[in-house]
Amino acid sequence: MADTRSRRLFTSESVTEGHPDKICDQISDSILDEILKEDPNARVACETSVTTGLVLVAGEITTSTYVDIPKVVRDTIRNIGYTRAKYGFDSETCAVLTSIDEQSPDIAQGVNQALEAREGQMTDAEIEAIGAGDQGLMFGYANNETPELMPLPISLSHKLARRLSEARKGEILPYLRPDGKTQVTVEYDENDQSVRIDTIVISTQHHPEVTLEQIESDLKQHVIRSVVPEELIDEETKYFINPTGRFVIGGPQGDAGLTGRKIIVDTYGGYARHGGGAFSGKDPTKVDRSGAYAARYVAKNIVAAGLADKCEVQLAYAIGVAKPVSISIDTFGTGQVSEARLVELVREHFDLRPAGIIKMLDLRRPIYKQTAAYGHFGRTDVELPWEQTDKAEILRQQA
């Protein structure tokens, strides 16, 4: 038997679009997208909560356009698949309550005209009059473990969750219902290379009449085998499929949901650090969102350039101040150049002021709903600007 003393296990999870917290993320980002379609400069901080038969949308929105929020809510729930009362939640009959205010003028004055501009250090044209919408710290991460430069556990967890929804919506497994969760445990060797999958956990909501045996058989055939590389599975890989034995009551009927409660699912599955800020429902002046996207963009380009096998980038901001108060890079001993040199390259080639990020990544567009389920990073099914590696070549040349 192989020596496993220096091997380690790492686990990440994902959830399907029908999970209560993810319903809320998708509603918040659908509202954001509808507003940005007509008013790209809108300020949006939209929070959603769901429970049995009820959706509450609250927050601060300053915009020149009108959006029929209840219609957006119902359309989103319908597209997810909650279309019948027997699912415990129905897009046509659920109550939708809204409580929307405008952005605080105290915050707006800091965002509208950044501190450096007020002090005469920079022109409004340079900063486009946008300071950070809040203080805070954000992390971005990339490694060369997968083609999309993401850690393998979260990558596979997302793919399993997305495949669950495809099997349901495509009626490959018509007894599936929208709520579900996935989890993958990967074994790493002493060189930190992934060698095998130790455990796969899938819990999926289902029709009450289907047997656990059928669910187990079908998910192995139609979900796991279609997603997980065969060479990573061996006879010792463990499967836990609906381990409680029954998952009929789910969605908002089973658990209340809230925007921003799946921040680790949204990012790197716990493989990298997290600054604590959620993404969904926030316009790009909120650095919780745009700063995290920029940090991923930086980290991915550093790894794509071959300057490190792993790279974690931390950005930090002060409210109303455009320039980040700190930029920190950790390559975990895998860097081809010093971390200090990488910070210099980042300052030179990436504009990490909020207005600079918005311009660099073209963020004033309705592109956010598609990020609200199955992860904001490492996506190969949708085009996201922070996933581009267009800076890799110049970083490689100048390192």
Curated annotation (Swiss-Prot):
Record: residues binding ATP: H19, D179, G180, K181, R246, F247, D255, R261, K262, A278, K282
Entry annotated with the keyword Nucleotide-binding: yes
The EC number(s) this enzyme carries: 2.5.1.6
GO (cellular component) term, any one: cytoplasm
Pathway the protein contributes to: Amino-acid biosynthesis; S-adenosyl-L-methionine biosynthesis; S-adenosyl-L-methionine from L-methionine: step 1/1
EC class name: transferase
Key words of the record: ATP-binding, Cytoplasm, Magnesium, Metal-binding, Nucleotide-binding, One-carbon metabolism, Potassium, Transferase
Entry binding sites for Mg(2+): D21
GO aspect biological process, one term: one-carbon metabolic process
Protein family per UniProt: Belongs to the AdoMet synthase family.
Subunit structure: Homotetramer; dimer of dimers.
Record's protein name: S-adenosylmethionine synthase
Protein species of origin: Halalkalibacterium halodurans (strain ATCC BAA-125 / DSM 18197 / FERM 7344 / JCM 9153 / C-125) (Bacillus halodurans)
